[in-house]
Amino acid sequence: MLKKIVTALGMSGMLLASSNAIAEDTTTKNDNLSPQSVDLSPLRNLNKLDSPMDKDYNYHQAFKKLDTEQLKKDMQDLLTQSQDWWPADFGNYGPFFIRLSWHDAGTYRIYDGRGGANRGQQRFSPLNSWPDNVNLDKARQLLWPIKQKYGDAVSWSDLIVLAGTVSLESMGMKPIGFAFGREDDWQGDDTNWGLSPEEIMSSNVRDGKLAPAYAATQMGLIYVNPEGPDGKPDIKGAASEIRQAFRAMGMTDKETVALIAGGHTFGKTHGAVPEDKVKQAIGPAPDKAPIEQQGLGWHNSYGTGNGDDTMGSGLEGSWTSTPTFWNHDFLHNLYNLDWKKTLSPAGAHQWTPTNAKPENMVPDAHKPGVKHKPIMFTTDLALKEDDGFNKYTQEFYNNPEEFKEEFAKAWFKLTHRDMGPKSRYIGPWIPEQNFIWQDPVPAADYKQVSTQDIAQLEQDIINSGLTNQQLIKTAWDSASTYRKTDYRGGSNGARIALAPEKDWQMNEPAKLEVVLTKLKEIQTNFNNSKADGTKVSLADLIVLGGNVGVEQAAKQAGYNIQMPFVPGRTDATQAQTDIESFNYLKTKSDGFINYTDGSVSADKLPQTLVEKASMLDLNIPEMTVLVGGMRALDVNYDNSQKGVLTTTPGQLNNSFFVNLLDMSTQWKKSDKKDGEYIGIDRKTGKQKWTASPVDLIFGSNSELKAVAQVYAENGNEQKFVNDFAKAWHKVMMLGRFDVQQ
């Protein structure tokens, strides 16, 4: 029924932007394109170009001007200042703002780190027009006077999350803290939110399983359809979809129960418009609304269009008799009332009790003295009927204080998961407690290495017997786990020495162990030799080793470079590392080292390279010079010679580009190996090289070829080496928020 209601709202034709998220069963706009048509848009930082802020604007600096206590007071005052153009249910906007924050943060997915509250994407299409976000345009509009007052000192993305957090506190639910630090985007991103961009509310579930790339069971929803799978009131099926959807954003069963039960303690849902009048009464979503509506959508011509006539999801009612106060009445009602399937006025499947007592009745949101029966969603009842969820609903029902504590922790995780490590947090309300989902690294309790120490360590590495290739690949494998989407991964923490990273196929565990053993030996000897408290971490030593490898490779090619090195990384422990969570950082392919696990078809490999480069926050020239340099350095996965287009493997030079663009070589597809190309000498007919689609894309794609030609030109040999060194250092520094703020 929700799908029917959504269609009636005029949203069935809304198109969502495609994505470059790589999944075997993901439909994207590149699926039917040839390799030379690879989409490079993920490498263009259009948000920076589109930003109206001054070039020297720094949010962290601007934030220092913010009076956070006054901001909080203004937010608290706003909650009970009901506006005629959108009256507050029960005289309090708190539940409305909780939904705003939840739906903003709840788009996060652990698979690729996309979504979440960071960057304020809910302000833009397609998220601002999703069916599940119906009427949240009004919530953001209610916040505008506060945003206008405080200006650049607070971002929209921080303000939206703060609104829900302050609302919780004002209604009796004490949060464990709040961190500022989210920065705003200035346009909608290209995330692929579902399998079928052509039809809103299309299912992302196949054979009962949620497609691995997504965190919502239907396009246009944050998690699941509250009526049940595909709008059918199937409690068992709803439980399965809830578990899959919440797990896709990194939530456990316990956290899932806490969030749903806690969130549905507050507010109401809206489906007041009769089913036969919905299509005529409700206008299009914001991105299709008439210009005179000024960005507000879902205009409602039924009755007053708001208040008791509000139309939202189509479900209608409240869960508890105290919808603006924290308690555990949701759980009390869940277990002590008998629930019967009914329909809302709008025709949506919901449940009402057959044995409600006067104390269970819910006050009308706008008419004093009027009472209604409480409601439950199909998804709410799943928390009772599913054995896994029931364990925690019973536990929370019997232990209200534990329920409160677990909700507070789950809310903090929900609203901060995509912010990355704690070092990115700013503001006065940061909780002291560390959580494993923050990927914590220990603080350095020792003196950092000096310039003289670094020189000594470099010599120790040179004398270790490790090859340049071993050092370079280990450093790359460590640092290249970084994801700019949720700021996870990177070299800090040295988690390449821990499970699960040490066992990943792409890291070649047996070879990795040889390198790590030698570096640990150097680390131990150095640390034991220092009496002044100076120490070096394995994380720093891995990066320093990569730098040594690059410097030595450049020297062998006739170039003297000094790689920058910034110490300060520390080593995480296995106890600080969530194995299941970190496995999502494992890549299916890494074109920089010509690696693939076989799950990505050969014609998609160039696009996965772009996706990988985007995750590393690289631009087109940086990606290009790194691939060319890595091929010349001969650091491919499993010693593959694909793309090693040089007669001096291991030397840092521009041979890859020179030979790729040399017309004396003719390229042909191999008839023996899929995804392999053979470079044949045009005169002799003999094989000269082998290459992958990733290699050849730099001569095939016009934009990439233009950059490749720059690096192949006479006179640009030193430029190539210098640019490689800069790009390499950038990758090694990804995740070093301790020195970048």
Swiss-Prot record:
GO terms for cellular component: cytosol. It catalyses: H2O2 + AH2 = A + 2 H2O; 2 H2O2 = O2 + 2 H2O. Heme b binds at residue 264. Binds 1 heme b (iron(II)-protoporphyrin IX) group per dimer. GO terms for molecular function: catalase activity; heme binding; metal ion binding. The record marks 99 as: Transition state stabilizer. Formation of the three residue Trp-Tyr-Met cross-link is important for the catalase, but not the peroxidase activity of the enzyme. Its cofactor is heme b. Residues 1-23 form the signal peptide. Keywords: Heme, Hydrogen peroxide, Iron, Metal-binding, Oxidoreductase, Peroxidase, Signal. Homodimer or homotetramer. Bifunctional enzyme with both catalase and broad-spectrum peroxidase activity. This is Catalase-peroxidase. It comes from Francisella tularensis subsp. mediasiatica (strain FSC147). The lineage of its organism: Bacteria, Pseudomonadati, Pseudomonadota, Gammaproteobacteria, Thiotrichales.
